[in-house]
Amino acid sequence: MHISTDGKAVLPRAHTIPHYALYGDNAPAGWSNMFNFEWIPERSSLYEWEIQPHLHGAFLQVLFMSEGEGHTLLNDSRWAMRAPALVLVPAGHVHGFEFNPRVNGVVVTAAQRPLESMAGVVMPELMQTLRTPMVMNLPEGGRHTEGLMPLFRAIEREWRMPAAGQVAAGLSLLTALMVQVARLNDTLEPSV
């Protein structure tokens, strides 16, 4: 990613921005459960801690940085992050990341439409959160911040251990995560 003299991110032309299910994977997503879970270092270290601008046509991503610092490129803006930080990237938004090698945290990629369908039934006002890109540097020890990691760990367990009802449980946990994101958005001033 290149930065102009005024601090704005300079993106390549729209037709050159790659589309991925997961960054760097050219094959279509093969997940039968509609979501993926990764620790940030798993993929970022393979790319020297820089994830170039790209987008996901049908997937949203939630990144929670629990340790370290970095920058998020979201559409045409670049945002500084320091842990704890949360980034929500709805489907169709160009994004990229630069991390320091001491970063840790999680990334969940999920099919946006099924998540929106579930939200539409259980909490229609959650749709705005699901469709709004955001970068938030979070307060340490805040009650909503503290509620994030247990949800991410539950999502990880569900993703790593296939079982009957995995899609239902996964979407339910992702919906609970999005409720926490909405609460954080209501109590904090997001960067985006």
Give the ranges of each region predicted by the language model:
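Short beta-strand His + acidic residue motifs that chelate non-heme Fe in jelly-roll/DSBH
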Residues: 71-73, 89, 95-101, 107
